[in-house]
């Protein structure tokens, strides 16, 4: 029977229970998360990423000094191209 490979996703979502054994040594028991836990973890992670992107975007926007309509247009187009390039690579 093939053993499931651990991926960064499963490693980050595994729940580790530490228990003391009879000899006083600690044992670790790994539990695989169920689909509800995975979805909850995914949604929380994506929400944090979206908030970070929005904050970074606003900070950049506010850092522009005396923006003209043309400079804003160039800035927005550059950000759009970069965003689309990242979307295609992911």
Curated annotation (Swiss-Prot):
GO terms for cellular component: host cell cytosol; host cell mitochondrial inner membrane; host cell nucleus; membrane. InterPro entries: Flu_proapoptotic_PB1-F2. Oligomer. Interacts with human SLC25A6/ANT3 and VDAC1. Interacts with host MAVS. Residues 1-20 have a biased composition (Polar residues). One of its GO terms (biological process) is symbiont-mediated suppression of host cytoplasmic pattern recognition receptor signaling pathway via inhibition of MAVS activity. Keywords: Apoptosis, Host cytoplasm, Host membrane, Host mitochondrion, Host mitochondrion inner membrane, Host nucleus, Host-virus interaction, Inhibition of host innate immune response by virus, Inhibition of host MAVS by virus, Inhibition of host RLR pathway by virus, Membrane, Modulation of host cell apoptosis by virus, Viral immunoevasion. Is not encoded in all strains, and seems to be dispensable for replication. It comes from Influenza A virus (strain A/Duck/Czechoslovakia/1956 H4N6). It is found in: Host mitochondrion inner membrane; Host nucleus; Host cytoplasm, Host cytosol. Residues 1-34 are annotated as: Disordered. HAMAP family: INFV_PB1F2. Residues 65-87 are annotated as: Mitochondrial targeting sequence. Pfam families: PB1-F2. Belongs to the influenza viruses PB1-F2 family. Plays an important role in promoting lung pathology in both primary viral infection and secondary bacterial infection. Promotes alteration of mitochondrial morphology, dissipation of mitochondrial membrane potential, and cell death. Alternatively, inhibits the production of interferon in the infected cell at the level of host mitochondrial antiviral signaling MAVS. Its level of expression differs greatly depending on which cell type is infected, in a manner that is independent of the levels of expression of other viral proteins. Monocytic cells are more affected than epithelial cells. This is Protein PB1-F2.
